[in-house]
Curated annotation (Swiss-Prot):
The keyword Nucleus applies. It comes from the Eukaryota. GO terms for molecular function: rRNA binding; snoRNA binding. InterPro entries: Ribosomal_uS4 (IPR022801), Ribosomal_uS4_N (IPR001912), S4_RNA-bd (IPR002942), S4_RNA-bd_sf (IPR036986). This is U3 small nucleolar ribonucleoprotein protein imp3. Signal peptide: none annotated. Gene3D superfamilies: RNA-binding S4 domain. Belongs to the universal ribosomal protein uS4 family.
């Protein structure tokens, strides 16, 4: 190997190639993206931002006094909306927002994952393909976006399109 020039040596002094820092905790996004077949990495980060905003709102509401009518009203509204979106289970509490609201909770409400849970498909990857090809409708509308968010009320209306050959089988 040739002798390094001055500016090359100067750049390499800032890096230690023998002992580099391992990023063991930064693989959560890759695992979630792979498990739920999220095609764009930006979707994961958008969900992460939403979770952060909701945690901030829940934290500010928890700091209010329990006798405050404004705080109680907004706590009920927040918990009601999260329950209707099926991000929280039955009888949610404000502590559930901090403990159970994750990016995976948002990903579990995506249309392909709901289809797998309803036994319409065996795997999430096949259900993503079916959604992209226009074989699935929610109510009267045909959905071609796999990132479609299915709420608790819309879950009953997820069916195959009438002209779909998959429905005939």
């Amino acid at each position: 190997m040739r002798k390094l020039k001055y500016h090359e040596k100067k750049l390499l002094t800032k890096h230690d190639f023998l002992n580099y820092k391992k990023d063991d905790n930064n693989h959560r996004d890759v695992n979630v993206i792979r498990r739920y077949h999220i095609p764009q990495r930006e979707d994961y980060f958008k969900y992460n931002q939403l979770v952060g905003l909701l945690l901030g709102i829940a934290n500010k509401l928890s700091l209010l006094e329990p006798t405050d009518s404004f705080g109680n009203l907004h706590k009920k509204m927040l918990l009601g909306k999260l329950f209707d979106m099926a991000l929280l289970t039955s009888t949610p509490k404000l502590s559930d927002v901090e403990n159970k609201l994750t990016v995976s909770a948002f990903c579990r409400r995506r249309l392909p994952v709901v289809m797998c849970r309803l036994k319409m498909c065996e795997t999430v990857s096949t259900s993503v393909k079916y959604v992209e090809h226009g074989h699935v409708r929610v109510g009267p509308e045909v959905i071609t976006d796999p990132a479609f968010f299915v709420t608790r009320n819309m879950e009953d209306f997820v069916t195959w399109v009438d002209s779909s050959k998959i429905r005939r089988n």
